[in-house]
Structures are given as structure tokens and as C-alpha cells.
Amino acid sequence: MHITYDLPVAIEDILEAKKRLAGKIYKTGMPRSNYFSERCKGEIFLKFENMQRTGSFKIRGAFNKLSSLTEAEKRKGVVACSAGNHAQGVSLSCAMLGIDGKVVMPKGAPKSKVAATCDYSAEVVLHGDNFNDTIAKVSEIVETEGRIFIPPYDDPKVIAGQGTIGLEIMEDLYDVDNVIVPIGGGGLIAGIAIAIKSINPTIKVIGVQAENVHGMAASYYTGEITTHRTTGTLADGCDVSRPGNLTYEIVRELVDDIVLVSEDEIRNSMIALIQRNKVITEGAGALACAALLSGKLDSHIQNRKTVSIISGGNIDLSRVSQITGLVDA
């Protein structure tokens, strides 16, 4: 028996996405972390989406969206824009489904993410310096080539695909008390919140954003969609200054809280994951654990069971060396 909410995505959409994704993606592991459990005085489980195909959760939403296109739409080809993880998810999904794909990435995108996107199948177009520049280029491609745009987060099928993580959490740890989720544009937390709250509304779903870029948190607390970005962040995968319209609506309705973490807290979380759990994550992937270590969630997590989403691990090795040389865990 599921609880139904009057929202753009329902638990039924996520269950349908699970069927589409069966055999196409990994059901990622979710082990208990002794280190984080001891530090946080609760039971902490890490959901390793950095071990997912393409190195992040993004393939879930990308494949669900692409596989739901009509045959006529598939023949037109698709286009997406991304700094990395969505690009890789779309590129691999195109290869799996036999769809011609084109991805627009900013000129400053990490070299490893550009290379991986090319390797999976899609044609990569490097354009502009930021998300607004890439969106403008995508609009031009849609107009001139007739391709179908695959949004990175603000789309019901994309949100439903990301929500399959919530189903896996409930399958593996039904008595979980809290789920801590990184936020960029909001697709991941929106999908997870629908899945979790439809099954058990007493479970808390808490978001985490970087202090430097927190459009969703600013919108959540002011009650209207707004933009927030002061400068860049180590969590470059979550460097989204304005949330999506659909994702904001879902987050406003279902998410229990959003906390902010500093750049030092993100860095220390990345180092702790490497040193204590032998796990390499990108900055965005370390956001949830940064919130756990910060003490800002102590009232929620002490003596309770908490899942922390490690959303991705696509980071240049040179960047890892730079980060680990700055701060001790």
C-alpha cells in the first residue's frame, strides 16, 4: 500500500522506471561504515552510486528518459548538456539503445569526463564557459537539427529514474530512519523523496548543498524559486544556481530539511572517504558525508539508522592529489 501525493511524479512512475532499468544498471551496494557510525554515534550506511555504470547515479534517469521515447523520437536523435555525469549517462544510454546522441559540455569540463563521454558513443561539442552557455547551444541544435532534448534533472522520467535509488534503499534497509542526499538541480533528491515517502512518510529525507552554490536551499527556505551562487565549489557536479520547477515543487512538499556545508567540510569528507572507507568520490559525491561529519545533523542521526548517498566518483586523479595534499582527515 503506497501513499499517493499530488505531484508530477508518482511511485508508479518509479516502479515503471525500475522495470526499464532492470539488467541495464547495477543495484549498488550499501554497506555499514564503521568509521562514520562511530563518528556520528549512529548506524551509517553508504549507498555507493559512485560504483554505478558511468561512475554516478545519472545513468538511471538518462536511460529511463531515453528508453521511454517513441521510435519516431529516437530516430531524430537526442541532445543533452552537462559538465560531466549527465553527459556520460546520456552517452552510454544512447549506445545501449542505438540512438544518435550529441552532448554539449562547457570548455572547462574535466578532461576525464569529456573523454569518457566520447568513449561511450555520443558526439561531444565543447561550447561556452557555463551552464547557460551550453543551454543556448542546445537550443540552437534542437532548432537546426530537430533533436530531442534530454534534461539533466527537471523532467518526470529523469526524476523517476533517479527515484529507483529510493526503492533499493527500502529493499535493503526497510527500517532506515534518515536518507541524506546531495542536491544540485534536485532530480536525485526529488526522485528519492517520492520513493521513500510513498512507502514510509515517517522516514526523513534531508538534502545537502554547498554554501557557495545553494539555489535549492535558498528557494526551499524563502518559499519561491530563487538563484544563489557566490563562487565555484569542489562539488562541481552540484554547481547549479537555480533549481528546476518540477524538482523544487517536489522538494518543497516532501523534503524535511536542507543543510549547507563549507568547502573545507566537503574536502575533509572526500579525504575521510578515501582514508577510512577506501572510496574515491568527486566533491558532489561527498556532500552527504560532509553533512554527517559537520555535526549539523546530530539530532537526526544519533542512535538512528541513516543512509548517506555517495552520488558519484568521477574526478581527475590530479584533482584527488591536490585535495589530499591540502588537509588531514
Curated annotation (Swiss-Prot):
GO BP: any one term: L-threonine catabolic process to propionate
Catalytic activities: L-threonine = 2-oxobutanoate + NH4(+); L-serine = pyruvate + NH4(+)
Annotated residues for binding of AMP: 53-54, 88, 119-120, 314
Biochemical pathway: Amino-acid degradation; L-threonine degradation via propanoate pathway; propanoate from L-threonine: step 1/4
Keywords on record: Allosteric enzyme, Lyase, Nucleotide-binding, Pyridoxal phosphate
Keyword Nucleotide-binding carried by entry: yes
Regulation of activity: Each protein molecule can bind up to four molecules of AMP, which act as an allosteric activator to the enzyme. The enzyme is inhibited by alpha-keto acids and other catabolites.
Cofactor(s) the protein requires to work: pyridoxal 5'-phosphate
Record-level Gene Ontology MF annotations: L-serine ammonia-lyase activity; nucleotide binding; pyridoxal phosphate binding; threonine deaminase activity
Residue list for modification N6-(pyridoxal phosphate)lysine: 58
Pfam families: PALP
Enzyme Commission designation: 4.3.1.19, 4.3.1.17
Cited InterPro entries: Ser/Thr_Dehydratase, Ser/Thr_deHydtase_PyrdxlP-BS, Thr_deHydtase_catblc, TrpB-like_PALP, TrpB-like_PALP_sf
Presence of keyword Membrane: no
Protein task: Catalyzes the anaerobic formation of alpha-ketobutyrate and ammonia from threonine in a two-step reaction. The first step involved a dehydration of threonine and a production of enamine intermediates (aminocrotonate), which tautomerizes to its imine form (iminobutyrate). Both intermediates are unstable and short-lived. The second step is the nonenzymatic hydrolysis of the enamine/imine intermediates to form 2-ketobutyrate and free ammonia. In the low water environment of the cell, the second step is accelerated by RidA.
Quaternary structure (record): In the native structure, TdcB is in a dimeric form, whereas in the TdcB-AMP complex, it exists in a tetrameric form (dimer of dimers).
Protein name (record): L-threonine dehydratase catabolic TdcB
Lineage: Bacteria, Pseudomonadati, Pseudomonadota, Gammaproteobacteria, Enterobacterales
